[in-house]
């Protein structure tokens, strides 16, 4: 039996967020609900943390921002090569996230 293409592909979602952001809390809840229905890799980046200055310069006034990317390659040391991100900004529904994931997986 061979794994299906879908099982071989991983999708990574990265949520750019900050504390005291109600839109960010809603976005986290949306992603959490979707994660219960389908597998994907997920991480959060707080743009206000000093080591994330690059992301702060880009997204400080735009959070929440969700990057949806396909993992193209994963090396033996765990580094990932990712597709260009599809981005969702501010307010997005579970259905919009799922549609974006499907688009990235194609």
Residues covered by each model-derived region:
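Pocket-edge positions in alpha/beta enzyme catalytic cores
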Residues: 16, 51, 86-89
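Thiol-based oxidoreductase modules, predominantly thioredoxin-like and allied folds used
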Residues: 39-53
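Non-catalytic, surface beta->alpha helical segment in thiol-disulfide oxidoreductase systems
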Residues: 68-106
């Amino acid at each position: 039996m061979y794994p299906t293409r879908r099982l071989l592909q991983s999708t990574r979602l990265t949520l750019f967020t900050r504390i005291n952001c109600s839109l960010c809390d809603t976005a986290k809840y949306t992603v959490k609900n979707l994660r219960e229905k389908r597998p994907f890799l997920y991480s959060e980046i707080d743009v206000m943390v000093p080591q994330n200055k690059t992301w702060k310069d880009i997204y400080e006034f735009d959070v929440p921002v969700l990057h949806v990317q396909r993992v193209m390659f994963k090396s033996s040391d765990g580094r990932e090569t990712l597709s260009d991100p599809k981005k969702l900004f501010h307010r997005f529904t579970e259905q919009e996230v799922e549609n974006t994931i499907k688009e990235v997986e194609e």
